[in-house]
Amino acid sequence: MAPAAASGGSSLPSGFSVFTTFPDLLFIFEFIFGGLVWILIASSLVPIPLVQGWVMFVSVFCFMATTALLVLYIIGAHGGENSWVTLDAAYHCIAALFYLSASVLEALATIGMQEGYTYKQYHENISAVVFSYVATLLYVVHAVFSLIRWKSS
């Protein structure tokens, strides 16, 4: 019974169908916006390292994990097994929670940077906050639809 469920519409895509199915299409946008977050924070020279260290960890970790999952899905490493659907749902739920915490901390750090930091650092961190919240939204949407797929598998 399990192989029939795995071969249904609720299984993970493989090959280039990853780029045409929802929510897996969101991998591309998570990759782009997550990459922008850590690039912007790194280019601002991490003025508040205690807070922004967590933001950097979350953004780089999620960037690398998203890239790894995307490559594994493209090469079809999951083989249609339900355990990969569970992994996908768990990863995106954890990533959404991590990104939410990182976004709040980055916004707090940026508010505190209004005075005493360069104009360039301040504006790079404003951009990082915006992209961090966009990445959070993408991971939340992906998590919700991954949980729906997990429940139906």
UniProtKB/Swiss-Prot annotation:
Side of membrane Extracellular, spans: 47-53, 115-125
Domain of life: Eukaryota
Subcellular location: Membrane
GO BP terms in the entry: myelination
Record's bilayer topology term: Multi-pass membrane protein
Keyword tags: Lipoprotein, Membrane, Transmembrane, Transmembrane helix
GO cellular component: membrane; membrane raft
Transmembrane segments: 25-46, 54-75, 93-114, 126-147
Boundaries of every MARVEL domain copy: 18-151
UniProt family annotation: Belongs to the MAL family.
PANTHER family for the chain: MARVEL-CONTAINING POTENTIAL LIPID RAFT-ASSOCIATED PROTEIN (PTHR22776), MYELIN AND LYMPHOCYTE PROTEIN (PTHR22776:SF12)
Function: Could be an important component in vesicular trafficking cycling between the Golgi complex and the apical plasma membrane. Could be involved in myelin biogenesis and/or myelin function.
Entry protein name: Myelin and lymphocyte protein
Originating organism: Canis lupus familiaris (Dog)
Gene: MAL
